[in-house]
Amino acid sequence: MTQNIHQDRILILDFGSQYTQLLARRVREIGVYCELWAWDVSEAQIRDFNPSGIILSGGPESTTEAGSPRAPEYVFQAGVPVLGVCYGMQTMAMQLGGRVESSTEREFGYAKVEVTAPGRLFDGIQDALSADGNAVLDVWMSHGDKVTAIPSDFTTVASTETCPYAIMANEAKRFYGVQFHPEVTHTHQGQHMLQRFVLEICGCAALWTPATIIEDAVVRMREQIGDDEVILGLSGGVDSSVTALLLHRAIGKRLTCVFVDNGLLRLNEAEQVMDMFGDRFGLNIIHVNAEARFLSALSGIADPEAKRKTIGRVFVEVFDEEAAKLPQVKWLAQGTIYPDVIESAASATGKAHVIKSHHNVGGLPEEMKLGLVEPLKELFKDEVRKIGLELGLPYDMLYRHPFPGPGLGVRVLGEVKKEYCDLLRRADAIFIEELHKADLYNKVSQAFTVFLPVRSVGVMGDGRKYDWVVSLRAVETIDFMTAHWAHLPYDFLGRVSNRIINEVNGISRVVYDISGKPPATIEWE
């Protein structure tokens, strides 16, 4: 009998912080299951979830403003430990009888917190000692408002020069508030603090590991699917690849994968996918070469969004045709991951700002009447990668730089043609190969080549040629929300440019994109 890896669980209420998903990932890294819900959940929902502890996230709003978010009253009546982070601390203080005010001195960035009283959350955790012999913590602050009076049954545990209540605690009720962000790496002991809260104060067992997640997923899929057959669109990307191997472990040959080669993949990618999953792992794969069909559909289309929608529509058509040949299939598998679920929930409640147009199997016709299998829907991307390693997928494949769903369709600017894709594939392969050779690939967050539909004069030997231009793009980023262009060495860029121009007949000029995000986006389209 498998362990119930969901038995100990943390509930994180989201007040809108940019770090909230990071907070959830940190709890998962400790080995404990958690879920992320909007702040305005009902008492019944919390009771039904039955958390071992609750964390209130940070957020961009001010508790001093009318109508600002509040934690449900039941949070403080449930009898479980509660940790308030930044805004979460402020709403905890205000709701339990303290006071919060807007501060003239805002704190953004590094700060030193001096611990002046004992407390379970921080005992024995420190970065340094003060002149008075107190523990000092290096933390990351990001707040304008601050608590100016704590609830009467709380004690002050720590402060900074400008924040008198940096940590507050009610040990009897196991309520804690921290004005800083323990989830970010800039708070050096942050993970240690979260570990103390989750494992010791909440009493959770660390059951959430790659091996136990795989075991749990296999059991649940077998229960869900029974003796039926399943179809999966396999792209060779991380999510669909891990989904395929999990399903294969659960139901073996009753899984049929459909790999659609749209002609917009990287150099030799189709062959690599078939070798990896067909030959090495023994999956049942239908390989559909639909390059001509996709390129025909894209003919004459230059608008990026129109290209995306066309690629998505044709994929659905091709996949639907293949699925229709398999009437015995009763289930459709998808590589939906937890951030997709969070995004969809936010969209449904009207709390999301921008929802990307996805071009996956989610648009399949309703008449297919297939049940849905989503074995990754509880997992963050980093967890999916760890499970992939546990299942035997190569590190280099799982940790490749991001590749857009529409593939080269959005890296060829303007109209997409086979000639352009073939040139771009070869140029990009040279760039990536040289990054690996120079040990630079893992030092940048994303690197790729873009095809520009303009010709430039070049000189080869004694003659002139009028050929195409490509741009190299490499960025460094933590969250892909903002990014800096990577300062690659000049001699490296020169070597890449020289190889592309000499080895890829049809390209006469190579440029390097030095735009940051913002104002530019990482991808050109």
UniProtKB/Swiss-Prot annotation:
Key words of the record: ATP-binding, Glutamine amidotransferase, GMP biosynthesis, Ligase, Nucleotide-binding, Purine biosynthesis
GMPS ATP-PPase domain boundaries: 208-400
MF terms (GO), sorted A to Z: ATP binding; GMP synthase activity
Protein name stated in the entry: GMP synthase [glutamine-hydrolyzing]
PANTHER family referenced in this protein's UniProt entry, alphabetically: GMP SYNTHASE [GLUTAMINE-HYDROLYZING], GMP SYNTHASE-RELATED
Top-level enzyme category: ligase
Quaternary structure and partners: Homodimer.
Active-site residues, Swiss-Prot/TrEMBL: 86 (nucleophile), 181, 183
Keyword ATP-binding among UniProt keywords: yes
GO CC, one annotated term: cytosol
Job of this protein: Catalyzes the synthesis of GMP from XMP.
